[in-house]
Amino acid sequence: MITLYQRTDCPFCWKVRLALAELSLHYECVDIRLGERHPVVQELSPSGTVPVMSENGIVVWESGVMLDYLDRRYGPGRLIPTAAAEEVRVRSLHTYSDRLLGACLFKLVKEKRSRPAAEWDQDVIRQAQRDWRVCQQWLDARIAGREFFGPQFGAADCALAARVGVAAAYGAGVEREFTNLYRWFEAVRRRPAWEAAYPTGFASSK
C-alpha cells in the first residue's frame, strides 16, 4: 500500500495526488497541518517537508521523483513520455512549474494566507499578479494547438494544474484572454482525477 504524507493544499502534494488518481491507485493519506513538524516526516525526509511517499520500504521525499516512480512502477509512459523529445518537453515544463511558476505564485499565496485581507501588502500582490500574467502568456504559447502539455495528460499537467488550482483558490485563476491556457485548465477541471485529488481546504488567516 502506498502511504502519502501530505498537506492538502500544498501544490507539490496536490500534483502527486493527481498522478495517483490518474493511475487509479489506492493509497493511504496522512494529513499534515501547515507548519507541523510531523515525527515520521522528520525521520523519513532530510528536508523535513511534505510530500513524503512510502511503499514496501521504498521512501521518496521529492515530488518529482514520486511521479517518476509512479510512472515506472504503475504506468510506463503514462506520466513521462518514452519518446526523447516529448520526455524533454514534459520534464522541462515540470521543472518550470516547480521552480519559476511556484516562486511567482508563492508570493501571492503567502501574502493572502498569512494575514487578514485588510492587512495585505497590495504592492506585493500587484507584482505577483504581473509576474503571473507573464507566466500565463508563456504557458499559453506552450499549450497552443495541443490538448495537454505532453502527448497525453501526464506529469507536466499534474504539476501545472496543481499550481494553477492554488492560484485560482486565492483569486488569481487563469485569465480568459489566455485562451489556450484557459481551455486547458477548464478541461483539466472536468477530469475525474481533479475532483478526486482536490484539496479539502486552503490555509487562510482569520
Predicted feature locations:
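GST-like domain detector, emphasizing the conserved glutathione-binding G-site
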Residues: 1-126, 130-133
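A local structural micro-motif
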Residues: 28, 175, 196-197
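Conserved residues at the C-terminal ends of beta-strands
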Residues: 56, 161, 200
